[in-house]
Swiss-Prot record:
InterPro entries: GHMP_kinase_C_dom, GHMP_kinase_C_sf, GHMP_kinase_N_dom, GHMP_knse_ATP-bd_CS, Homoserine_kinase, Ribosomal_Su5_D2-typ_SF, Ribsml_uS5_D2-typ_fold_subgr. This is Homoserine kinase. Pathway: Amino-acid biosynthesis; L-threonine biosynthesis; L-threonine from L-aspartate: step 4/5. The gene is thrB. It is found in: Cytoplasm.
């Protein structure tokens, strides 16, 4: 059995812990019953020996499978990872959603997206990445107790993402510690109004509103100061045709949205300006986690 889970970009500027979308950059997980347990990793993380000793996917899969079947079975795990680790592109959420979904499939039990997301909250308390990883598209999500409430909007082929990926990783937990505990009324209204406008812009496909609607006063500038080159990435992207340019999650990647016809030029100009960074031109994913075999 093989499943795939897309990368995600969350926050999207003002939508802190709430807004996210899925990208056509995927991790693929293959699981097969075996006499002995084994793990094989290709792609991102393949050179990290810790991922073979304490693998989060394997742990979550086995915990979920045991709850569903009350069985302890050995499996052979094969991972083909395209999502960069610790770069703000939802690699952890892909693992969580993938492991829970795979456990249900292997146990031959059906699960709704709501059920998968509810279980995922035990491992990730913020819904902005796990929701688009599960259902694809652009998502608005919130939580109450053990439930995720969300709405999803498929993204059209007329827009694309250009993602700039520095080689420097970022720790989400450390990044959160640098943020203020309180915000002024002025900044709160600034973000609330733009988060609302950004959501409406995505649902109505008013791409002309994205630049203003994606401005933020909660987290981006503070996080970007840890890696000042990101200010230049954002400036260059907006100058060269991006409709919006935002820190992806807690970073260090930067998400840029543009019209489909502008994507090759924007990607090339960003690559020329930042030759030491990876630049990927990506479609959006509207399916979320899917079974591939």
């Amino acid at each position: 059995m093989t499943i795939s889970v897309p990368a995600t970009s969350a926050n999207l500027g003002p939508g802190f812990d709430t807004l996210g979308l899925a990208l056509e950059l995927k991790n693929r997980f293959s699981i097969k019953p075996s006499s002995l347990s084994s793990i094989q990793i290709r792609g991102e993380g393949s050179k990290n020996p810790k991922l073979r000793v304490d693998n989060i996917f394997v742990r979550i899969f086995q915990e979920t499978f045991a709850k569903l079947t009350e069985e302890r079975t050995n499996f052979r795990f094969q991972f083909h990872n395209q999502i960069p680790i610790s770069r703000g592109l939802g690699s952890s959420s892909a693992v969580i959603i993938g492991a829970i979904s795979a456990a249900f499939m292997m146990a031959q039990k059906k699960a709704t997206p709501e059920e998968i997301l509810s279980l995922a909250l035990a491992y990730e308390s913020h819904p902005d990445n796990i929701t688009p990883a599960c259902v694809g598209g652009f998502t608005v999500a919130t939580t109450r107790e053990n439930s995720v409430f969300y709405i999803q909007k498929p993204l059209p082929d007329s827009i694309k993402a250009v993602v700039v990926i520095p080689h420097r990783p970022t720790s989400t937990s450390y990044s959160r510690q640098t943020l203020p505990k309180r915000y002024s009324m002025r900044d709160s209204v600034f973000n609330l109004s733009r988060s609302s406008l950004l959501t409406a812009a995505f649902f109505s496909e008013r791409w002309d509103l994205l630049r203003e609607a994606s401005r933020d006063r909660f987290h981006q500038e503070i996080r970007m100061k840890q890696f000042p080159a990101l200010f230049e990435v954002q400036h260059t992207a907006l100058k060269e045709g991006a409709l919006m340019s935002t820190l992806s999650g807690s970073g260090s990647s930067f998400f840029n949205l543009c019209l489909k016809e502008d994507a090759p030029s924007l990607a090339q100009k960003l690559q020329d300006r930042f030759p030491k960074f990876r630049v990927l031109e990506l479609k959006f994913d509207n399916k979320g986690v899917v079974r591939d075999d």
